[in-house]
């Protein structure tokens, strides 16, 4: 097989490139494109022999695209226009312009690529931009399948539910193709169970209007229970976390932790402990789960990722018992017994599937590393999709 010639758009720190390597598909990345200067430094540090174009995608002409002579596109367009916490500007968001430029260029290429893989946030599947993408690739003759996948399905203790699309230039559909459906798991062989469907794409307009109640985790049922237990958690949330920690198909976090680190430099400051005590998602090295790490991790506390309890012999329930009735000093003393720390950038990179040799230039700060990793993707998930796509 001739090595594939892959074009990596919105390359970031090189998650797609790393996944392509892991897939063991013979391939060369002919060019990577990104405007983020810090991300580009990290990319060059890890992939020094790849042509890196530090320019906007809108600035690349049809002729320049043709000259690159690629037959595969790997891309992870900006997710902010589609996030739940963003404004969801969709096609009207200026950050979508570069992707619209790609959709405009694609049908006019001298030679269409054979393969396309796209990653984005959950929510992209409900967007007008997604509709334009589907319309464009269908008109070009691609067969495609959409997915919503999390690394937990590969035994990795990190929730990072993301949208993926794989497309292949061929007349026959994929063996697992489910028209109008978004698959919630990797394709099974015929001897295994049929795939789960998340969304019927035809009905998504009505779903937008009614605002469906969605269970994001297939391991638990949507529960009406609202009993607040310790911290600001409902009985349903506690139950879900216990179920995740009991799932023996998922590895423990300790497999992904660094041995020799200065723990103290990653401890949560007392002010954060006081302010966010009831909102923290606390995990232990023996836990089999962690929240999605976002680009604000280490800087913001709420909703940006889990924190690690390093004293395993202390029961968290005992620490939180009657916490609200204590003075500030007593609260800090009690919470400090948990020795809560942030995950290090290296540990997050491990959970995202980057190999041990993947590194950061010394000049990059911890804050920059968190930000870049929060914008990246899970290498193992993408590697598996590349194998499925090229099979």
UniProtKB/Swiss-Prot annotation:
UniProt keywords, alphabetically: Cytoplasm, Methyltransferase, RNA-binding, S-adenosyl-L-methionine, Transferase, tRNA processing
Protein name (record): tRNA (cytosine(38)-C(5))-methyltransferase
Main subcellular location: cytoplasm
Reported function: Specifically methylates cytosine 38 in the anticodon loop of tRNA(Asp). Has higher activity on tRNA(Asp) modified with queuosine at position 34.
Active-site residues, record numbering mapped to chain: 79
NCBIfam families on file: dcm
Source species, domain of life: Eukaryota
PROSITE patterns: C5_MTASE_2, SAM_MT_C5
Family (UniProt): Belongs to the class I-like SAM-binding methyltransferase superfamily. C5-methyltransferase family.
Localisation per UniProt entry: Cytoplasm
Residues annotated as binding S-adenosyl-L-methionine: 13-15, 34, 57-58, 76, 376
MF (Gene Ontology): RNA binding; tRNA (cytidine-5-)-methyltransferase activity
SAM-dependent MTase C5-type domain location: 4-391
UniProt KW Iron keyword: no
Keyword Transmembrane: no
Gene (UniProt): TRDMT1
């Amino acid at each position: 097989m001739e090595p594939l010639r892959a074009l990596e758009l919105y390359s970031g720190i090189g998650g797609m490139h790393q996944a392509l390597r892991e897939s063991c598909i013979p391939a060369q990345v002919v060019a990577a494109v990104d405007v983020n200067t810090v991300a580009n430094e990290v990319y060059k540090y890890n992939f020094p022999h790849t042509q890196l174009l530090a320019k906007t995608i809108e600035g690349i002409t049809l002729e320049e695209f043709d000259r690159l002579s690629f037959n595969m596109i790997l891309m992870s367009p900006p997710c902010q226009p589609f996030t739940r916490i963003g404004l969801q500007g969709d096609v009207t968001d200026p950050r979508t312009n570069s992707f619209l430029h790609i959709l405009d260029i694609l049908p006019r290429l001298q030679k269409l690529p054979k393969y396309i893989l796209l990653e984005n946030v959950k929510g992209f599947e409900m967007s007008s931009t997604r509709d334009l993408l589907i319309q464009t690739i269908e008109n070009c003759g691609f067969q495609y399948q959409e997915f919503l996948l999390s690394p937990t399905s590969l035994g990795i203790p990190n929730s990072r539910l993301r949208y993926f699309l794989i497309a292949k230039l061929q007349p026959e559909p994929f063996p697992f193709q489910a028209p109008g459906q978004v698959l919630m798991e990797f394709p099974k062989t015929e001897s295994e169970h049929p795939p789960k469907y998340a969304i019927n794409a035809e009905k998504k307009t009505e779903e937008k209007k009614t605002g469906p109640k969605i269970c994001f985790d297939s391991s638990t049922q949507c529960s009406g229970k609202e009993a607040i237990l310790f911290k600001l958690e409902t009985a349903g949330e506690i139950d879900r976390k216990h179920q995740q920690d009991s799932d023996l198909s998922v590895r423990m976090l300790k497999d992904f932790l660094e041995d020799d680190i200065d723990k103290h430099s990653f401890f949560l400051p007392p002010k954060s402990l006081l302010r966010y005590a009831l909102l923290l998602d606390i995990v232990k090295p023996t836990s089999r789960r962690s929240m999605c790490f976002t680009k604000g991790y280490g800087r913001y506390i709420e909703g940006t990722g889990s924190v690690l309890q390093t004293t395993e012999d202390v029961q968290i329930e005992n620490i939180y018992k009657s916490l609200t009735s204590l003075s500030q000093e007593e609260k800090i003393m009690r919470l400090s017994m948990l020795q809560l720390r942030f995950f290090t950038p290296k540990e997050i990179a491990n959970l995202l599937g980057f190999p041990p040799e993947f590194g950061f230039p010394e000049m990059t700060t911890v804050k920059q590393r968190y930000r870049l990793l929060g914008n990246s993707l899970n290498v193992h998930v993408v590697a598996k999709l590349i194998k499925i796509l090229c099979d």
